[in-house]
C-alpha cells in the first residue's frame, strides 16, 4: 500500500497541469503586423504570434456573431446546433437544448470554466460557465471593451484558479472592433473608438489604454474596399479601436503570466468573422470567411514564431480543447441522429509532419445574421478552390444594420445613385444578386470575381467539391440540404417541389 501511494505521488509530480485560454475578437480581421499589415501598430498581437504557430489559412465556420460563437463553444455547425442567427433581443435565435457544449463537457470532467466579455449565445442551460462576467449581467462596453475592467475580472478568475486544483478553460470575448451603436454619429465614434480614450469629453477614461490615432492617409485599404476618403476615414477609426484590442491582448497575456499559468496553458487566438465592411462580415467570400488564427502551446515551443499552410477553422476549437484535456466527445443523439464532431484537433498541426486530408479543406454554413437576413450559404474551401452554394439566390443578398449604416457603404451607395465612379472592384448589382453556385479558382482569381461554376473546364472540379460538400451536409444533418429545388421530408428523403412530381407523391401517399 505504501509503495502504491509513493508511486501515485511520484507520477502525479510528473503530470503537467493543462489549461486553455481562448482569445476571441469581435469582427477582427487581418489588421496586424503579424499578418502583413505594415501600417498598423500591433505589438502585443505580434508578440503573441512570436510564441505561437500562425495559421495562414484560418477561417470562420460562419460569418456572423452569435452563430460563430455557438460553433466555437459547441463544435457543431449552425445548421446542426440550432443557432441560425443572432441571439440577442427580438432575434431570439438559440441552440437546441440537447447540444453538449464545451463548458458543459468540461464541467463533467472536473475542469473549471470561465468567460469574461461578450457571450451572445443561448440558452444558458447549454452555454453555462462556472464563472461568468458577460453582457447578460453587466454593460457590454464595460466588460467587453474596457480593458482595465476586463483585466480585473480576469485576474479574479486566475487568482481563484491558483487556489483550485482543477485545470481551467478561460474564454475571453473581446467586443472590439465591432462597430458602435448608433452606427453613425454617436458620441462614442463609429467603432467606439472614442470610448474611454481620455480625449473626448463625456466618453470616460480607460486607464490601461494608450490610444493610437491614425490619419486617413496612414491606413492600408484592402482590395475589397474602394479607396475613397470615406473609406479611409472609416478605416482610421477602426485602426484606433484595434489599438485598444491589441493592448487588451497584452494585458490579458500578462495576467496569465503573473498568475503563473503561462507555462501550462494552451492559447487559441482568433475572431468570430471578418471586419464589418462590404464583402467581408456576413459574407463567405475570403474577407468574411478568413480569420486570424494562432495557437500557442507551451509544450510545442519549436513551433513558436512559425507559420503553417494547414487549414484551420473555428469548428476545430472544440476538438482541439478536448484533445488537449484528453477528453472524448460524448455519444448522444439529436433529432434521432447520432451527433459527432466534423472538425479536427489542430494540435496535430503542431507536430513535425502535418497529416494530409483534414488540413486541406474547411466548411462553412450560414443561415441568418439578423432575422430579416435570410440568405443561407454552404461552402467548401480548399487551398486553391472555393465552392459556394447560395440557397436563396433568387432573393437579393440582405445587409446587416451595421453594414449599410456606415460611411463606407453609404459612400458606395451615393456614388452609384449619382453615377460617380465608386472605385469599388465590384458593383452593387453583383453584390446583391448572386448565382446559385459560385466556384472560384483562388490561385488565378484570389479576389473571387470570376464564377467558374458553369465552365466545362471546371466540370469535374465542381462535381468533386459538390459531392464532398453534400456529404458533409448529410453527416451534420443539415435540414436545408435539399434546397432550393427539393424539400426534406421526415424520412430524410429529398422530394422535388415541382407540381407534377408533388402530385404524384400525393397520389402515392393516398394509396
Regions from the PLM with identified roles:
Residues 55-56, 79-82, 177-183, 275-278, ...:
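Secretory-pathway/luminal and periplasmic proteins that interact with or process carbohydrate-rich
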Residues 3-17:
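Cleavable N-terminal signal peptides of Sec/SRP-targeted secreted and luminal proteins
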Residues 17-21, 51-56, 109-114, 163-170, ...:
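Loop/turn elements at helix/coil->beta-strand transitions in domains of secreted/extracellular proteins
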